[in-house]
Structure formats: C-alpha cells, structure tokens
C-alpha cells in the first residue's frame, strides 16, 4: 500500500501474466474496468491451476498465512518496454480504480478440492 494507506496495484499494457501457486496459498485482487463485474478476488492453491491476468487489469496479491511460492510466466506483446510496464498505481491517484474498490462488491473465486 502507498504512503497514505491506499491500495497499490500493478497494470500492464503489453503483457499478460500467468500465475501458478506451487506451494501455500495466495489471494489475487483484480480490477478490470472493461469487465461486466470489474472487481474480483481469486484464492489460489496448488490445486487451482494457473490464473490468467490479462493486460489492462489492475492486480495485486497477498500470500496466505503459511506463505506461498508462485511462478509468474509472462506473455509479452509488441510494444513491451520493461521501463514502462512495472510501476505501482495507487487507488488514491486513480479515480476509476478508487470508485470500483469503493462501490463494487468483489466476485470471490475459490477452488475447493
């Protein structure tokens, strides 16, 4: 989170992320302004499979209490520039992101096996 306590997210314009938990658990928080339901919480474990985070999606994650090991495989598109893709975005500085977090109920996803 940023210096005023607002949530910080990453967003990529030229990269999709594929995240797979190999140990422990991790919760991903996703916001995509183009989706019908823009706010999602996704709880992943080893049994869950990979999570696709498409470009244009605000995302952040947090390990479960036992910690986690996650593999992130990226698919990059023409126009990718590492110096421009990996910067945090604060909800306090992005009005659309702030409004989704404040006004939308998250869709919660968990795989139970």
Protein language model features and the residues they cover:
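Conserved SET/PR-domain catalytic core that frames the SAM/AdoMet-binding pocket
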Residues: 46-59
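Active-site region of the double-stranded beta-helix
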Residues: 1-46, 62-113
């Amino acid at each position: 989170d940023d210096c005023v306590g607002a949530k910080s997210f990453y967003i990529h314009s030229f990269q999709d992320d594929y995240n797979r938990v190999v140990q422990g658990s991790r919760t991903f928080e996703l916001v995509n302004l183009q989706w019908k339901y823009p706010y999602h919480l996704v709880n992943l474990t080893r049994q869950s499979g990979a999570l696709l985070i498409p470009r244009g999606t605000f995302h952040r994650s947090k390990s479960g209490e036992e910690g986690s090991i996650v593999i992130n495989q990226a698919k990059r598109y023409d126009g990718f520039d590492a110096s421009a893709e990996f910067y945090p975005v604060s909800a306090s500085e992005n009005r659309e992101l702030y409004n989704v977090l404040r006004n939308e109920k998250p869709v919660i996803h968990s795989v139970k096996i």
